């Protein structure tokens, strides 16, 4: 984790001469106003730093030094001696960023004014306004390069030296490497970052909460795999853009400073999409307000991380652990470089690529100064890797440039977006050592040659740097152990995957063998089924052939029977014709008999009516005679009474005679009814015979249009046999019918059958 190094332990600084008379608040400390106090590359100018008490002791002769001391960044032993004052040096100003002593402060003697270095006509030294410095370095008074055409900060102005806090109040002592400004090691505190805009300090706690939620193991770094796994809800392209902002160097891990810088770049609309590269904004412009999309992003990201379980990536290699060649290298952070690289650097901090690029223009470095054209309309300083290739001895942990170390004096640039490290380049240890050496030996030859006194430095800087390097060595050992554990875990995973692949191959072979066996079994079953179907088909064909032979034999037999059947049919036809002739003759005779019967019936009815009239007349006559007989009997009875017979005998005889006469009349009436019924029966029998004859005529009314031989030849054997059976049935019915008619005639009227 790229955290700020703690303060050097007490007693590590070598003793020096007594400080100025009066201490930090004495008269010697107040003689800073008449001239520019001292100009240090990347060193602060101003009052005390509340966060670094007791870190840097007052340097011997710091107040008595009448000139301005120059240092190329935090490297030790690069301070210069006093320089002659120049007319172009502006007076230092006091304010919240750097409290310089007033001109009327008492002191033992006047201090000599150190002029600013003489610049070419294109540049001039100007003091940075107090509202332009980063919020985390309020006591610094940085100076900027400014074009001679303008005395104010404009679009073409570029920060060259970053502001850093002063070591003690009232003195401008030499800054002691990367360990001089002690920062709190707890990153959970919401101090504004060096590159944090003034108007967005309230975003620090929210971003810290999001970062802590993403940092599941609590080591201060978020792996790219974890972040990609979390941010996949935004889409592949958006995740790629986010990782480009949050990890521009391609190290595979994200620190909180990188996270904050990336979110700030996204919020400010960085066109290049890189956290540490960009364009210096105008000083007078207010910081951009946080858009609603940024608030939504932070809120959604925090909710997503707190609601979802942290899942570590165990299947892919991190980008920081992959091996690259000399052509694909990136700048190694000084706080995360290996121990060998730190030792080869000679204890110096990260070089100032701005000055290194000015020294090596032939290797692709480019310095864009104010007043010169730029593709984006702004003046930037960009360090581009040269064409030189160096071997990379050993493996070491590499990380991005931390904005916190940028603010603490690691780089001599006031803007954390000053350097633009290429995400696809990675420098070797020799390259880093060369940069560190050049940074330590840099004398600003492009601007002005400093005095030889700048190469002197206190011994306490070396002690602090040794402590710093020891801590870096411990951190690198921890990183190496973590890398070894990860490599062992990946090797274990690889072994498991190999075993799994072998198991899958064996399973595949077993499946193939099983499939072959199944294919063979199915082929055998199909062959057996085919043989069975062929046998059944052959048996069925044999049965059909046998059946066909039987049908042929039956057909031949039926053909042999056909002539006999034809002869029988002809004989039956002759008999039928004879019967039809007889029926015709009988029909004629029947019609004649019916005519005679009708005439006889008419005659009979006439006689019956005549008989009925005679009967009625006879009945009336009988009635009259009976009455007369009764009258005569009464007279006879009276005469017998007169003769003396008894009346009872005569009355009984009278009744018996009357009863006898009634019975005789009843007998005659019944006989008449019997005769009437017989006549009706005869009439009904005649009607039955007539209807039977008409039915016989209808049966024989069918006309034969074709000859019997033609009909027989045109039909099949089955149809012929069926027709013969029907004809035999009809003949049998006709024979039976004729017999019944003859029997009925013989019973009713046998005279019809008599030959006349």
From Swiss-Prot:
Gene Ontology biological process terms, A to Z: cell division; early endosome to recycling endosome transport; endocytic recycling; Golgi to plasma membrane protein transport; negative regulation of adiponectin secretion; positive regulation of cilium assembly; positive regulation of mitotic cytokinetic process; protein localization to cilium
Domain remarks in the Swiss-Prot or TrEMBL record: The RBD-FIP domain mediates the interaction with Rab11 (RAB11A or RAB11B).
Signal sequence bounds: none
Positions of Ca(2+) 1 binding: 215, 217, 219, 226
Residue ranges the record marks as coiled coil: 485-694
Important for binding to DYNC1LI1, as annotated region: 2-435
UniProt PTM: Phosphorylated at Ser-102 by CDK1 during metaphase, and dephosphorylated as cells enter telophase.
Domain (EF-hand): residue spans on this chain: 202-237, 234-269
Protein name as catalogued: Rab11 family-interacting protein 3
PANTHER family: RAB11 FAMILY-INTERACTING PROTEIN 3, RAB11-FAMILY INTERACTING PROTEIN
Protein task: Downstream effector molecule for Rab11 GTPase which is involved in endocytic trafficking, cytokinesis and intracellular ciliogenesis by participating in membrane delivery. Recruited by Rab11 to endosomes where it links Rab11 to dynein motor complex. The functional Rab11-RAB11FIP3-dynein complex regulates the movement of peripheral sorting endosomes (SE) along microtubule tracks toward the microtubule organizing center/centrosome, generating the endocytic recycling compartment (ERC) during interphase of cell cycle.
PTM sites of type Phosphoserine: 52, 102, 281, 348, 488, 538, 647-648
Membrane topology listed for this record: Peripheral membrane protein
Residue segments, region Disordered: 1-204, 645-664
Location of region: ARF-binding domain (ABD): 484-588
Residues annotated for Ca(2+) 2 binding in this entry: 247, 249, 258
Domain FIP-RBD: 694-756
Biased composition, class Pro residues, residue ranges: 1-24, 84-94
Biased composition, class Low complexity, residue ranges: 27-39, 53-68
Subcellular location: Endosome membrane; Recycling endosome membrane; Cytoplasm, Cytoskeleton, Microtubule organizing center, Centrosome; Cleavage furrow
Keyword Kinase (UniProt): no
């Amino acid at each position: 984790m790229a955290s700020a190094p703690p303060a050097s332990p007490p007693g590590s600084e070598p003793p020096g001469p007594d400080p100025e008379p009066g201490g930090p608040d004495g008269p010697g400390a107040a003689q800073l106003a008449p001239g520019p106090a001292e100009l240090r590359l990347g060193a602060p100018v101003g009052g005390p730093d509340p966060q670094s008490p007791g870190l840097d002791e007052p340097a011997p002769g710091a107040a008595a030094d009448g000139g301005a001391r120059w240092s190329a960044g935090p490297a030790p032993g690069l301070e210069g001696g006093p320089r002659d004052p120049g007319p172009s040096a502006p007076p230092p100003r006091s304010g919240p960023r750097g409290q310089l002593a007033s001109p009327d402060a008492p002191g033992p003697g006047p201090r000599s004014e150190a002029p600013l270095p003489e610049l070419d006509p294109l540049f001039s030294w100007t003091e940075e306004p107090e509202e332009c410095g980063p919020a985390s370095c309020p006591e610094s008074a940085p100076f900027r390069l400014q074009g001679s055409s303008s005395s104010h900060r404009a679009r073409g102005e570029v920060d060259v030296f970053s502001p850093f806090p002063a070591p003690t109040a009232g003195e401008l002592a030499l800054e002691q490497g990367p360990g001089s400004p002690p920062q709190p090691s707890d990153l959970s505190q919401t101090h504004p970052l060096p590159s944090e805009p003034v108007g967005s300090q309230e975003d620090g706690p929210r971003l810290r909460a999001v970062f802590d939620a993403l940092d599941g193991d609590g080591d201060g770094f978020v792996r790219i795999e974890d972040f990609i796994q979390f941010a996949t809800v935004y889409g592949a392209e958006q995740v790629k853009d986010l990782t480009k902002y949050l990890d521009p160097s391609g190290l595979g891990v994200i620190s909180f400073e990188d996270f904050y810088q990336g979110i700030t770049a996204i919020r400010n609309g960085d066109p290049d999409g890189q956290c540490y590269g960009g364009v210096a904004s105008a000083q007078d412009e207010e910081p951009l307000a946080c858009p609603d999309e940024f608030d939504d992003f932070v809120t959604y990201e925090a909710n997503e991380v707190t609601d979802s379980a942290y899942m570590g990536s165990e299947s892919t290699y991190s980008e920081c652990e992959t091996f690259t060649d000399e052509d694909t290298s990136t700048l190694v952070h000084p706080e995360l470089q290996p121990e060998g690289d730190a030792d080869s650097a000679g204890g110096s901090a990260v070089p100032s690529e701005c000055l290194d690029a000015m020294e090596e223009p032939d290797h692709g470095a480019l310095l864009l100064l104010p007043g010169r054209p730029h593709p984006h309309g702004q003046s930037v300083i960009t360090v581009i890797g040269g064409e030189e290739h160096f071997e990379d001895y050993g493996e070491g942990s590499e990380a991005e440039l931390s904005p916190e170390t940028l603010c603490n004096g690691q780089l001599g640039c006031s803007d954390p977006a000053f350097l633009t490290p290429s995400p696809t380049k990675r420098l070797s240890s020799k390259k880093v050592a060369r940069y560190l050496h050049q940074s330590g030996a840099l004398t600003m030859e492009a601007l002005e040659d400093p005095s030889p006194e700048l190469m002197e430095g206190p011994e306490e800087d070396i002690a602090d740097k040794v402590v710093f390097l020891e801590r870096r060595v411990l951190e690198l050992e921890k990183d190496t152990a973590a890398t070894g554990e990860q490599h062992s875990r990946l090797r274990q995973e690889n072994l498991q995957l190999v075993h799994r692949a072998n198991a899958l191959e064996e399973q595949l072979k077993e499946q193939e063998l099983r499939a072959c066996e199944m294919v063979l079994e199915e082929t055998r079953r199909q062959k057996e089924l085919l043989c069975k179907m062929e046998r059944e088909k052959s048996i069925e064909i044999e049965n059909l052939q046998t059946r066909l032979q039987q049908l042929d034999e039956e057909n031949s037999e039926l053909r042999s029977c056909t002539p006999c059947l034809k002869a029988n049919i002809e004989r039956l036809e002759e008999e039928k014709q004879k019967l039809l002739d007889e029926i015709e003759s009988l029909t004629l005779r029947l019609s004649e008999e019916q005519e005679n019967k009708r005439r006889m019936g008419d005659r009979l009815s006439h006689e019956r009516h005549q008989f009925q009239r005679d009967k009625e007349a006879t009945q009336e006559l009988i009635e009259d005679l009976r009455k007369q007989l009764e009258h005569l009997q009464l007279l006879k009875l009276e005469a017998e009474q007169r003769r003396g017979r008894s009346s009872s005998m005569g009355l009984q005889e009278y009744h018996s005679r009357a009863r006898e006469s009634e019975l005789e009349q009843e007998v005659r009436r019944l006989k008449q009814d019997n005769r009437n019924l017989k006549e009706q029966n005869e009439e009904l029998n005649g009607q039955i015979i007539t209807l039977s004859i008409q039915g016989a005529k209808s049966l024989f009314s069918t006309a034969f249009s074709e000859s019997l031989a033609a009909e027989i030849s045109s039909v099949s054997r089955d149809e012929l046999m069926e027709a013969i059976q029907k004809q035999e049935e009809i003949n049998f019915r006709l024979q039976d019918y004729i017999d019944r008619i003859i029997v009925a005639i013989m019973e009713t009227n046998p005279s019809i059958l008599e030959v006349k």
